[in-house]
Amino acid sequence: MLRGSLTALVTPFEKSGRFDEKAFRAFVEWQLGEGTTGLVPVGTTGESPTLSHDEHRHVVKVCIEVANGRAPVVAGAGSNNTAEAVGLVQYAEKAGADAALVVTPYYNKPTQRGLYEHFAAVARATKLPIIIYNIPPRSVIDMMPETMGRLAHDFKNIVGVKDATGKVERVSEQRMTCGKDFIQLSGEDASALGFNAHGGVGCISVTSNVAPRLCAEFQEATLSGDSVKALELQDRLLPLHKAIFLEPGVSGAKYALSKLGKVENVLRSPLVTVEESTAAKIDAAMKHAGLIN
């Protein structure tokens, strides 16, 4: 069962721009020690668009090795090319991932029927559980609850969604079309409280890269019904949720992690490091959360 605080892992790079495997192994180990309940490598936060296919596969392999069964690994395996997505999912299955995260095809804007056919092809090609990643702001298309419901009913291995629509009511709508056992995970940290209140069971989080223990405690509080603690942690984390997204992409999270000494503040072009004004706001949010002095 995928539940709680799953981290959308950053991919550390050396100053030369190469994948920093040593830092990544240590980072995954730290995440597990801090209470993270699931690991999601090579998604958007892992800078998958700028990884080669060989690098993509290597990051997945390393993550699975380090996890060693201690937490589920949900391997990013999305593409706007159906055949390519199938290949990535099949590799994830061969490597020993526990599930695959498959994003809705971006840029080429398929219809709802096209979305159905894309995910149907992926589902037929693997036995891995598949989590649909619905993120309209980046993909420019939105999988409707009815389409998701058809997929969930037609394919037993389409088991859940990472929902980054920003519409918390979708949880209820998707429960009606997909069934009460369909796994619904928030794709937005700031609204995860409301998402879980509607029946969600966790979050694939960016902030948990930086504050894994707090995010894990927050998810546990929401899912156990401890509203007092959940609100306390929400207020503690909200400035950080907002600050690390003041600039697009993973730039904010990598800056914050560099402050903690976990990774180098290195991104691959076209992403760039945050502006000084943004860095100051992230610093303030980290202090508010109690992560730095």
Curated annotation (Swiss-Prot):
SUPFAM superfamilies: Aldolase (SSF51569)
EC top class, as a word: lyase
Disulfide bonds: none
Site features described as Part of a proton relay during catalysis, chain residue numbers: T44, Y107
UniProt subcellular location: Cytoplasm
One GO term (biological process): diaminopimelate biosynthetic process
Cross-referenced Gene3D superfamilies: Aldolase class I
GO molecular function: 4-hydroxy-tetrahydrodipicolinate synthase activity
Main location per the UniProt record: cytoplasm
Keywords, alphabetical: Amino-acid biosynthesis, Cytoplasm, Diaminopimelate biosynthesis, Lyase, Lysine biosynthesis, Schiff base
UniProt feature coiled coil, ranges: none
Cellular component annotations (GO), alphabetically ordered: cytosol
Key word Cytoplasm present: yes
Transmembrane segments: none
Entry's EC annotation: 4.3.3.7
Record: active site: Y133, K162
Protein family per UniProt: Belongs to the DapA family.
Record note on quaternary structure: Homotetramer; dimer of dimers.
Annotated PANTHER family: 4-HYDROXY-2-OXOGLUTARATE ALDOLASE, MITOCHONDRIAL, DIHYDRODIPICOLINATE SYNTHASE
UniProt-listed HAMAP family: DapA
Role, per record: Catalyzes the condensation of (S)-aspartate-beta-semialdehyde [(S)-ASA] and pyruvate to 4-hydroxy-tetrahydrodipicolinate (HTPA).
Protein name, per record: 4-hydroxy-tetrahydrodipicolinate synthase
Protein source organism: Mesorhizobium japonicum (strain LMG 29417 / CECT 9101 / MAFF 303099) (Mesorhizobium loti (strain MAFF 303099))
Gene that this sequence comes from: dapA
